[in-house]
């Protein structure tokens, strides 16, 4: 049995499959009954976030008159008919307790603080969006959008697309599913298609589309479009459909009531990645949004565009994201139980969005949209998705879960389909030919498959089931085989008194670096101590290491590891080394947020027991990344070689190096102590620490030089374009030019000559601008006593308090009499006493954000003045740390939840 390295107990138990999700900013959400519990995997027993599922009032969709009799002693406003038309399940479901059914994290950058949004679908069919309480100082997450309410308003404004004639308002007879679809039963029942294809959303057929020669031409489907409404005042397109002018108090048939309720009853949610499109020649017209898919009981999937904020902040804000309904796809004839998104295309010019949907009728379909259609869809509200292929036809066994990944290793799409019978299928689709073939179908479990998760670019697959088994599979070419989950765990710190009496496993999720696995399990309460454990431990989240898994790679281990050590075999060391290097290589992608928590935690665990293995992995990564080849030389000889290459490597590599230096190789030192050593003297008797301190110092100086150069270049370009081009408020404008110039003067002997030249040009330009704001801000004031502050360091400052003039003494006493101030790590200006951006790795504060160009630089620019003006166009500047590259956040008290990228 695999050994967990940490765990987190839950006070409530999950009830549905796919109960756990891992966000791209390193937070874990668990749908546990009437609560959604958010956990920081770096502090599993620490503070948590909560979402309490509220009771939902039924929507006013109509009244049903009894077809045979009128019940006496009931008010005239009540019409009942529970035994006809399928109304009995609709009535019974309102008596159930609130419960979270499905959840999905958005991509990073959707929250106002550049974090992730969480979409939650309840058992009552309601979908809402939540943001973290970054400025509210509470544990409860903040609801920002009620998507179900928006859907109700849109549909009710059109009378649900039904004809006004009473003779045509009735629908066909229907079968239904058992409403209580909890994991304890999970039975599949037949159900006919709901009459949702006549919504007043224009219907269109895409059966033989010329742009997709390989799509399934036999399976017809309906894509429902949103109509464009005109405002009476200015005639422009309105972003929202008109609201209903009346409540639905008319009498309707039971069949119509069930049909309307099925349209509004959501079952599953899925976020796409954050998409970026330029709608014009200027970056000011950049479109940034994510697609939110919501599956319903009617078999339809509604596609919503949720636009990202134009700017990010950490102050309190009541602004909600702009959300628009773009299309409703009649995807299946029964409940849409699960969905998954993917992106096909190596670059933005050939981007294709892929949506896979699974239904309780056993069918699975693949939908696709081109980039041009997505951009057009934003403007004219037309659906851009067409049916690419029906992978699985109607089947009596329902689809319980999906996992979909587009593998760059195989240049193919890998689709895993979990079913209620305990089996799962793996399908492969070639991107070039769009040929879809089934690789395997296996009876992996005895009960319903409750979770599937791909790892290592589609080479490994995890499956879990209600039978409490978790299995690991390796995909090699067109075959899949099961491999055992390694029992050896580096740095095992799991508590021994944690019970192992689990009943079922209800979800599996992978960390951003793929090195850790999270499992959510329900306890068998009857086997727990009724006095203590049974009261507070209904379920648990287990964490397993995934680094020792075979990933299909055939790399040989380094010669240094020649025998088993500390219970690890030579092959396990080889797998760890391969997976470490794979994860580090993946983070070179600028579109992937720099979240290194799992890698840092694993390296620290190995460092305690086998530090030479960590040094071996880092030596190989540093030599390959910085020198271009594997240099099998000692670390003390390698460091001088790579430090000379800093100006020729991308900024992302420098950020990864800084994080590893601080959190792994200098982990014995506190962050404040590391910062002090970077500015002052070091101990000569700590050779290894001095080696990494020197490497960290030179890497951070390289990043600061790039920032200073970009700041000077942006200012000069903006000054030269005045009078010829209208000034744009969207361009990034540098701050603290006076402080940046002083830093260049202090470090004139080590900075590149190009920076000295630019600094002199900026100084001359500021002198010519008599009304320049930068010139007036050359002398800074203390925000507490208004005393002058001189520039002596880029990290901190001391004001010249009037008290210190009365007493000329040592520097220490002088500093005691003055205020110690922090400087912004970007502008080097004195930070005001207001909420600031905070880095969890280097503990620096940031007032002004660095330009996005800095994080994408492939090397130090040879000619900063030749950079195009578009390099400084503001496309929602991302709050990333200048030195670490991780997401900045507002500093929270220790008793409140916050994400830990490292």
Predicted regions and their residues:
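Beta-propeller domains
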Residues: 2, 26-93, 130-155, 216-250, ...
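Canonical WD40 repeat/beta-propeller blade segments in eukaryotic WD-repeat proteins
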Residues: 11-20, 96-110, 152-168, 172, ...
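Structural hallmark of WD40 beta-propellers
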Residues: 25-29, 111-119, 278-282, 286-293, ...
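Short C-terminal beta-strands that terminate individual repeats in beta-propeller domains
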Residues: 8-11, 50-51, 92-94, 257-260, ...
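Conserved strand-to-loop turn within each blade of WD40 beta-propeller repeats
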Residues: 32, 121-124, 295-298, 358-361, ...
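C-terminal scaffolding/assembly regions of large eukaryotic complex subunits
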Residues: 2-13, 19-20, 26-27, 524-902
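WD40-repeat beta-propellers
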Residues: 36-41, 103, 127-132, 269, ...
């Amino acid at each position: 049995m695999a050994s967990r390295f940490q765990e987190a107990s839950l006070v409530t138990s999950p009830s549905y499959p796919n109960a756990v999700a891992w966000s791209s900013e390193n937070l874990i959400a668990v749908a546990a009954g009437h609560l959604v519990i958010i956990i920081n995997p770096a502090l599993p027993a620490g503070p948590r976030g909560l979402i309490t599922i509220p009771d939902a009032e039924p929507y006013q969709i109509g009244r049903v008159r009894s077809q045979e009799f009128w019940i006496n002693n009931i008010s005239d406003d009540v019409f009942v008919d529970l035994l006809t038309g399928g109304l009995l399940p609709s009535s019974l479901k309102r008596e159930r307790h609130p419960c979270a059914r499905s959840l999905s994290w958005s991509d990073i950058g959707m929250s106002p603080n550049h974090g992730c949004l969480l979409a939650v679908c309840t058992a009552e069919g309601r979908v809402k969006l939540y943001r973290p309480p970054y400025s509210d100082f509470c544990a409860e997450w903040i609801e920002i959008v009620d998507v179900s309410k928006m859907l109700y308003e849109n549909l009710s404004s059109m009378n649900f697309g039904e004809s006004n004639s009473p003779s045509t308002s009735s629908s066909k007879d229907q079968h239904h599913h058992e409403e209580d679809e909890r994991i304890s039963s999970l039975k599949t029942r037949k159900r006919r298609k709901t009459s949702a294809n006549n919504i007043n959303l224009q219907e269109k057929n895409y059966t033989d589309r010329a742009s997709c020669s390989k799509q399934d031409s036999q399976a017809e489907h309906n894509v429902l479009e949103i109509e464009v409404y005109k405002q009476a005042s200015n005639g422009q397109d309105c972003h929202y459909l008109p609201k209903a002018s009346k409540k639905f108090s008319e009498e309707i048939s039971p069949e119509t009531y069930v049909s309307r309720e099925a349209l509004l009853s959501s079952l599953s949610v899925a976020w796409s990645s954050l998409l970026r499109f330029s709608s014009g020649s200027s970056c000011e017209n950049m479109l940034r949004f994510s697609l939110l898919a919501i599956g319903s009981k009617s078999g339809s999937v509604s596609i919503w565009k949720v636009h990202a904020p134009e700017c990010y902040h950490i102050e309190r804000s009541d602004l909600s994201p702009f959300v628009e309904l773009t299309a409703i796809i009649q995807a299946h004839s029964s409940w849409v139980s699960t969905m998954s998104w993917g992106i096909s295309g190596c670059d933005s010019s050939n981007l294709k969005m892929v949506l896979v949907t699974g239904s309780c009728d056993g069918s699975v379909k693949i939908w696709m949209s081109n980039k041009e259609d997505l951009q057009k869809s934003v403007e004219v509200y037309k659906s851009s998705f067409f049916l690419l292929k029906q992978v699985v036809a109607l089947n009596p066994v329902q689809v319980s879960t999906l996992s979909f990944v587009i593998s760059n290793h195989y240049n193919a799409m890998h689709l895993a389909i979990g079913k209620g019978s305990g089996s799962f299928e793996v399908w492969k689709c070639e991107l070039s030919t769009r040929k879809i073939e089934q690789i395997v179908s296996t009876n992996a479990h005895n009960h319903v498959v409750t979770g599937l998760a791909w790892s290592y670019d589609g080479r490994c697959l995890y499956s879990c089931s209600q039978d409490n088994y978790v299995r690991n599979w390796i995909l090699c070419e067109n075959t899949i085989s099961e491999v055992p989950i390694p029992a050896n765990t580096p740095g095992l710190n799991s508590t021994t008194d944690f019970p192992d009496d689990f009943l079922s496993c209800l979800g599996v999720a992978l960390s951003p670096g793929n090195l850790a696995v999270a499992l959510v399990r329900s306890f068998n309460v009857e086997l727990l101590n009724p006095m203590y454990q049974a009261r507070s431990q209904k379920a648990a989240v287990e964490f397993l290491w995934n680094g020792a898994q075979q990933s299909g790679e055939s790399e040989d281990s380094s010669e240094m590891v020649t025998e088993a050590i500390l219970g690890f075999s030579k092959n396990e060391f080889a797998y760890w080394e391969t997976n470490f290097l794979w994860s580090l290589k993946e983070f070179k992608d600028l579109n992937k947020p720099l979240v290194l928590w799992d890698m840092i935690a694993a390296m620290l665990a190995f460092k305690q027991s086998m530090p030479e293995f960590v040094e071996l992995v880092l030596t190989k990564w540093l030599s390959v990344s910085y020198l271009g080849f594997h240099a099998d030389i000692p670390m003390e000889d390698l460091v001088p070689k790579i430090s000379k290459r800093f100006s020729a490597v991308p900024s992302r590599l420098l950020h990864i190096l800084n994080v590893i230096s601080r959190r792994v190789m200098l982990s014995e030192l506190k962050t404040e102590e590391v910062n002090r050593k970077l500015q002052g003297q070091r101990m000569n008797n700590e050779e290894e620490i001095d080696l990494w301190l020197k490497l960290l110092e030179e890497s951070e100086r390289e990043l600061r030089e790039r920032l200073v150069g970009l700041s000077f270049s942006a200012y000069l370009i903006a000054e030269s374009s005045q009078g010829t081009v209208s000034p744009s408020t969207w361009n990034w404008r540098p701050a603290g030019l006076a402080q940046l110039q002083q830093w260049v003067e202090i470090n004139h002997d080590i900075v590149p000559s190009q920076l000295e030249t630019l600094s002199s040009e900026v100084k001359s330009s500021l002198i010519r601008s008599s009304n320049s704001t930068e010139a007036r801000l050359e002398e800074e004031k203390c925000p507490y006593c208004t005393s002058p502050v001189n520039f002596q360091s880029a990290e901190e400052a001391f004001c010249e308090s009037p008290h210190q003039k009365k007493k000329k003494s040592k520097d220490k006493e002088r500093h005691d009499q003055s205020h110690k101030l922090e400087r912004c790590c970007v502008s080097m200006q004195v930070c005001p006493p207001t909420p600031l951006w905070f880095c969890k790795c280097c503990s620096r504060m940031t007032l002004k954000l660095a330009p996005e160009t800095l994080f994408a630089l492939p090397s130090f620019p040879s000619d900063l003045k030749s950079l195009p003006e578009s390099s400084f166009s503001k496309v929602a500047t991302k709050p990333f740390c200048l030195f670490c590259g991780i997401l900045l956040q507002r500093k929270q008290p220790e008793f409140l939840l916050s994400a830990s990228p490292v």
